[in-house]
């Protein structure tokens, strides 16, 4: 089946353990059986059905195309003793499951970025200085490090806000940390690609001199379609070459999915309400 005749992917925002709402949304969107299902990361945590949610996605096999989000990496870090569970986390049932090792192995082998048919899927964003090729190269470096025998040491070194800007000469763990920060945590940066982490609010909460990563003039991925999640306060954002899918399901808002047709005019949005998955802690 060629790309031109295959069913368009259906891309979902952050699920965060909201399994019931995911099932409702999948039934409502009713994609063809051969349609790939893309997930913008944060499959688990904060919602009450994280274990069942994770098992459902794994059971989809190759049809599921998830990228890693910060909550997925947090689960790996807690499992490795690098981080401790936080108030509001709902990952203990995963860690206590008899098949925990298999599930954690599966998560550790998911990509940080996926590119197909002119569409790039990431969890949080792409630095404005990165084109598609560099984004995929950097994501691949981090993916291989997380799949290697020394993955725990790598994972422990990914936390922190420095370096906060891209430089081609970055090497080692600094390079991997910068890649992870951009792909899984970024919201705002300035025109030079310096990231800011002081705000997780909507566009209006940008610190002086900063803007959403996707609004930086001359962004090198502006000619392709970038699909992302992570930014619940932003809400659903649909532009011709930009699709922000985190509409705050775990905040009791909505869970969103978009049919990723090649033509922006043919893309369709499906949503369900998420009042039943409101978490106590955000």
From Swiss-Prot:
InterPro entries the UniProt entry points to: ApaH, Calcineurin-like_PHP_ApaH, Metallo-depent_PP-like
Reactions that this protein is recorded to catalyse: P(1),P(4)-bis(5'-adenosyl) tetraphosphate + H2O = 2 ADP + 2 H(+)
Key words of the record: Hydrolase
Keyword Hydrolase (UniProt): yes
EC number(s) reported in the record: 3.6.1.41
GO molecular function annotation: bis(5'-nucleosyl)-tetraphosphatase (symmetrical) activity
Enzyme class: hydrolase
Hydrolase among keywords: yes
Domain of life: Bacteria
Entry-linked Pfam families: Metallophos
SUPFAM superfamilies: Metallo-dependent phosphatases
Family annotation (HAMAP family): ApaH
UniProt function note: Hydrolyzes diadenosine 5',5'''-P1,P4-tetraphosphate to yield ADP.
UniProt family annotation: Belongs to the Ap4A hydrolase family.
Name this polypeptide is given: Bis(5'-nucleosyl)-tetraphosphatase, symmetrical
Highest classification ranks of the organism: Bacteria, Pseudomonadati, Pseudomonadota, Betaproteobacteria, Burkholderiales
